[in-house]
C-alpha cells in the first residue's frame, strides 16, 4: 500500500544477517564503510571517543531537537556512548520503556515505538528529528515450532516443513510489523504537525533453506 502511494527505492547496505550498527552509521553520516578496516564497527572503534558529522548535527543547526529511540538495551553496540557523539540530544532505550510486550523469542515488540516516538515529538516545542530503531523481527530464528499462533501460513513445494519453520516465524513477525507501521502512520497523521516519515531496512535476515 505504501509502495503504491509513496516514493520508494532500493538501498544498498553493508550488512547481512546482522550488523545493524554499521548500516546506521552509513545512513546517519553518509560515510561508506569501504574506508574502514575489514569487519570494523565505527561504533566500537571511533565514535565512543570522537564526534562525527551526521544528519543529526545538520538538523540541530537548523533548530531541530534530535532524539533516538530503540526498543533494545542501550548498551548494545555501545549506542549509549555513541549517539551523543553523533549529535543526538536524547536516547530512549528499552530500560526506560514501560509496558513492553515481547515476541516468542523475547525481543520487544515494535508497538512500543509508536508511543515513544509521539512522546519524543511532544517533549519539545521545536521541530524534531526522531531516529527510531526497531528490533521485533530480529533473529536468531527458530528451527522448531514455538507453539504460537501464526495468522500467515507459509508453504512450499521445494522446502521441507522443518526448513519452513524460520521462514514462517519471520513472515508472521513482518505481518505484525505491518500493523505497527499502520498504527504509527495513523498516530503521526493525527499528531498535528507536518511530518515526514522515512523507512528503511538495515539488513536481510539470516535465514537459509537446506
Predicted regions, residues:
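Solvent-exposed soluble domains appended to multi-pass membrane proteins
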Residues: 1-210
Amino acid at each position: 500500500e505504501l509502495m503504491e502511494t509513496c516514493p520508494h527505492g532500493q538501498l544498498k547496505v553493508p550488512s547481512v544477517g546482522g550488523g545493524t550498527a554499521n548500516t546506521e552509521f552509513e545512513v546517519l553520516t553518509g560515510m561508506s564503510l569501504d574506508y574502514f578496516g575489514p569487519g570494523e564497527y565505527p561504533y566500537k572503534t571511533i565514535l565512543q571517543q570522537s564526534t562525527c558529522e551526521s544528519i543529526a548535527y545538520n538538523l540541530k543547526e537548523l533548530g531541530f531537537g534530535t532524539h533516538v529511540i530503540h526498543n533494545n538495551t542501550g548498551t548494545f553496540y555501545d549506542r549509549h556512548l555513541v549517539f551523543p557523539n553523533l549529535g543526538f540530544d536524547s536516547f530512549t532505550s528499552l530500560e526506560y520503556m514501560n509496558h513492553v510486550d515481547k515476541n516468542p523469542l523475547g525481543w520487544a515488540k515494535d508497538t512500543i515505538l509508536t508511543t515513544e516516538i509521539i512522546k519524543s515529538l511532544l517533549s519539545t516545542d521545536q521541530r524534531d528529528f526522531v531516529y527510531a530503531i526497531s528490533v521485533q523481527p530480529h533473529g536468531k530464528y527458530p528451527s522448531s515450532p514455538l507453539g504460537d499462533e501464526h495468522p500467515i501460513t507459509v508453504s512450499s513445494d521445494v522446502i521441507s516443513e522443518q526448513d519452513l519453520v524460520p521462514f514462517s516465524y519471520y513472515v508472521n513477525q513482518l505481518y505484525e510489523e505491518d500493523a505497527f507501521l499502520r498504527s504509527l502512520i495513523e498516530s503521526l497523521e493525527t499528531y498535528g504537525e507536518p511530518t515526514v516519515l522515512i523507512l528503511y531496512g538495515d539488513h536481510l535476515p539470516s535465514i537459509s533453506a537446506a
